[in-house]
Regions:
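Active-site-adjacent structural elements in enzyme catalytic cores
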Residues: 1-213
Length: 213
């Protein structure tokens, strides 16, 4: 057995989190003696980090699989840390201070209705193609049907946030293998699980998010 077992979701801080044993082995090959495969992460954007202030209040420092709506069922007062709302100040939670969960290629995230996201991605794609860039797409089935299928990772249907949360990191890691110059990604609204998804996507994109509603 290895002398020092690794925790789940072990990773390098500047890389997307591995959510399968194969992805852990890819990152840790040559650094560890063994990887025990307990199956893929169930949610994908796993941990919600909160600060507890007495019995009746929690402050969300990093959104995750446990959503605001879930917390409100058991805690009277649930607030967001001001750094999440304003984007200013020093975040308290790990992984919130710098560009994090990031693929090798720069990424732009587009958020809005299906039609407007498709149109904006098409415009961005045409410009990048004219520059000779190789583009990767992280999109839903509906939006993906409008683009070449090479270098594309499709997570599922447009409104399936659970599928995107589950496959986000696997999708980002796939582009490191495909060697793309730029990643164009379809985001979601920040309701429910969407809050955690967009938190991770914004970090991966270095804040480069375009709203087209």
């Amino acid at each position: 057995m290895p002398a020092f077992p690794l925790p789940d979701q072990c990773q390098f801080i500047d890389r997307p989190s591995p959510t399968t044993a194969a992805e852990v082995m890819h990152d840790m090959d040559g650094r560890v003696d063994m990887v025990i495969d307990g199956g893929p992460c169930h949610i994908g954007v796993e941990s919600t980090i909160v600060e507890c202030s007495g019995d009746d209040k929690v402050t969300i420092l990093r959104p995750g699989g446990v959503t605001i709506e879930m917390l409100k069922e058991i805690v009277p007062v649930v607030e967001m840390d001001t750094t999440l709302v304003t984007g200013k100040g020093v975040p308290k939670a790990p992984g919130m201070k710098y560009r994090h969960y990031a693929p090798s290629a720069p990424m732009t995230v587009v958020v809005g209705t299906e039609d407007k996201v498709t149109a904006k991605l098409q415009s961005l794609y045409e410009g990048l193609k004219a520059e000779g860039k190789t583009v990767g797409f992280l999109v839903s089935e509906e939006v993906g049907s409008h683009f070449p299928h090479k270098n594309m990772y499709v997570w599922g249907h447009h409104d399936d946030k659970e599928a995107l949360a589950n496959q986000l990191y696997t999708g980002l890691l796939s582009f490191d293998s495909d060697v793309v110059d730029v990643i164009l990604a379809e985001g979601v609204d920040d309701e429910g699980l969407g809050l955690a998804i967009m938190n991770r996507m914004k970090k991966a994109a270095g804040g480069h998010v375009i709203l087209v509603d």
